[in-house]
């Protein structure tokens, strides 16, 4: 969640504006966040200003709107006058401070937190194997990567591969009863294709989606279950009992 937001604006007001009467209004989702009056000293010069944004008004999808109120004379103004302008620089940016939440290991919101449609950044989702994957493991990973990739669309996606290690971010783990990364060596054996959500052993804010199986064929069946969407995700772990051919 966002705990702090600060809008950093670079702008240049027209030298013909009336000070104080001319101003720049800042809105977030149509709520007024602040007003920047144009002073005499700022006319025709580049100005840097900061506007605090109340994080309580930040939603899943947000819009920052700037409204210029400009005056160049006290009476008989022409609203279409070429002297009425304020140029906002492309160096302007919104600075956000985040606080991670300790999410429960609950698959009912899957594919969150591994993919969130509200996040417009490129998806980076590491794939972790015990060692170099064989052909069936590669097929399972390709199915899951394709499924996530079909959802990211224009955002783009990246699936870095790691052997017998753990990244510091949400990841997909492939493990069988006989072949698994070291951090899962004490995990109990499974008797069916299983999908489990667990916390990173060193960071509870990072989640791991573990695709478990008795063997590689189970991994492939679990991957197909995810792709076909016929798995009822709930709780921290589910089994994939049947998939379409």
Locate predicted features:
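Solvent-exposed alpha-helical segments and adjacent loops
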Residues: 1-245
């Amino acid at each position: 969640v966002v705990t702090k937001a600060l809008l950093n604006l670079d702008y240049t007001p027209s030298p013909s504006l009336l000070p104080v009467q001319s101003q720049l209004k800042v809105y977030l989702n149509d709520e007024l966040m602040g007003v920047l009056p144009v002073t005499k000293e700022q006319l025709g010069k580049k100005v840097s200003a900061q506007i605090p944004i109340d994080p309580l008004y930040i939603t899943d999808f947000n819009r920052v709107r700037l409204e210029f109120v400009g005056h160049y004379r006290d009476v008989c103004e022409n609203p279409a006058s070429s002297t009425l302008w304020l140029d906002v620089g492309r160096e302007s940016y919104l600075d956000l401070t985040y606080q991670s939440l300790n999410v429960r290991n609950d698959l009912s919101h899957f594919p969150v937190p591994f993919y969130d449609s509200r996040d417009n950044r490129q998806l980076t989702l590491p794939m972790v194997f015990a060692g170099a994957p064989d052909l069936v493991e590669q097929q399972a990973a390709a199915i899951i990567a394709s499924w996530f990739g079909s959802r990211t669309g224009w955002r783009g996606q990246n699936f870095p591969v790691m052997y017998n290690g753990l990244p510091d971010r949400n990841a997909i783990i492939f493990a069988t009863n006989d072949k698994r990364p070291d951090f899962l060596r004490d995990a109990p054996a499974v008797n069916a294709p299983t999908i489990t959500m667990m916390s990173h052993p060193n960071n509870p804010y990072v989640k791991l989606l573990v695709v478990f199986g008795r063997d590689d064929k189970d991994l492939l069946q679990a991957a197909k279950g995810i792709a076909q969407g016929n798995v009822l995700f709930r709780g921290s772990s589910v089994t994939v009992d049947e998939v379409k051919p």
